Curated annotation (Swiss-Prot):
It comes from Mycolicibacterium paratuberculosis (strain ATCC BAA-968 / K-10) (Mycobacterium paratuberculosis). It is found in: Cell membrane. Its cofactor is Cu cation; Zn(2+). Residues 39-55 have a biased composition (Low complexity). Its EC number is 1.15.1.1. A lipid is attached at C20 (S-diacylglycerol cysteine). One of its GO terms (molecular function) is copper ion binding. Binds 1 copper ion per subunit. Binds 1 zinc ion per subunit. SUPFAM superfamilies: Cu,Zn superoxide dismutase-like. This is Superoxide dismutase [Cu-Zn]. Destroys radicals which are normally produced within the cells and which are toxic to biological systems. May play a role in favoring mycobacterial survival in phagocytes.
Length: 227
C-alpha cells in the first residue's frame, strides 16, 4: 500500500509549483491575459483641446453721420479693471485727414438737428449732452475724454486706447451714453495760463475750452449699447 504524504508536504509542493510557473504578462490580444489595472485612470481630457478662456465682456457701437452714413465702429472690452476702446473707420472719405476729438457723452441719443439738454440752438447730436462723468467724478479731464483719432489721407483711421475712468455698468446705466467723433482736434484744455489769456483778460482756458476741448462740431455719433 503506497504511503500518503503529509498535508504539510502537499502544501509545500503547491507553493513550489506556483513559484515555478512562468509569469503572466498583460496583453491586448483577444483571449490573452488582460491588462492589469493600476488604479490610475488616464488623465482626464488627455488628447482633447483645452477649453478656451472666457471672452471679456464687450460692447460694439456703430457711429453714423447726421445723414445716416456709417462712419466707424467702436468696441469697448472690459478686463483687468480697465476698458480697451478700439475705433475703426468703416467708410473712407467721410472724416477729413488729421486729428479728431473723441468723447463719450452723457446721454444715449444720436439725433441730427437736436437741442442740448440745457437748451439753445439746435445742432447735430446736441441732445447727447456734454462729456460723460462717471458717478462720483468731477473736474477735467472728464471720464468720457478719450484719445483723439488720427485719420490718414485716404480718410481711414484706427484708434486703440485704454482707460480706467469708467466701467461697463457706468456706460449702460441711467440714460445710457453716446460716443461722438468731432470735426477737429481736441486740445484737452492745454492752454497754459502763463502764456495765454482769455478775451476778458483771465489767464488760461475758458469754460468752453475746459468742457469741450474745442474739438468743434459733432460729425459722427453712436449710442453705446444700442448695437
Amino acid at each position: 500500500m503506497p504511503k500518503l504524504l503529509p498535508p504539510v508536504v502537499l502544501a509545500g509542493c503547491v507553493v513550489a509549483l506556483g513559484a515555478c510557473s512562468s509569469p503572466q504578462h498583460a496583453s491586448s490580444l483577444p483571449g490573452t491575459t488582460p491588462a492589469v489595472w493600476t488604479g490610475s485612470p488616464s488623465p482626464s481630457g488627455a488628447g482633447a483641446a483645452e477649453a478656451a478662456p472666457a471672452a471679456a465682456p464687450s460692447i460694439t457701437t456703430h457711429l453714423k453721420a447726421p445723414d445716416g452714413t456709417q462712419v466707424a465702429t467702436a468696441k469697448f472690452e472690459f478686463s483687468n479693471g480697465y476698458a480697451t476702446v478700439t475705433i475703426e473707420t468703416t467708410a473712407n472719405g467721410v472724416l477729413t485727414p488729421g486729428f479728431h476729438g473723441v468723447h463719450i457723452h452723457k446721454v444715449g441719443k444720436c439725433e441730427p438737428s437736436s437741442v442740448a439738454p440745457t437748451g439753445g440752438a439746435p445742432g447735430d447730436f446736441l441732445s447727447a449732452g456734454g462729456h460723460f462723468q462717471a458717478p462720483g467724478h468731477t473736474g477735467e479731464p472728464a471720464s468720457g475724454d478719450l484719445t483723439s483719432l488720427q485719420v490718414r489721407k485716404d480718410g481711414s483711421g484706427t484708434l486703440v486706447t485704454t482707460t480706467d475712468a469708467f466701467t461697463m455698468e457706468d456706460l449702460l446705466g441711467g440714460r445710457k451714453t453716446a460716443i461722438i467723433i468731432h470735426a477737429g482736434a481736441d486740445n484737452f484744455a492745454n492752454i497754459p495760463a502763463e502764456r495765454y489769456n482769455q478775451t476778458n483778460g483771465t489767464p488760461g482756458p475758458d469754460e468752453m475750452t475746459m468742457s469741450t476741448g474745442d474739438a468743434g462740431k459733432r460729425v459722427a455719433c453712436g449710442v453705446i449699447g444700442a448695437g
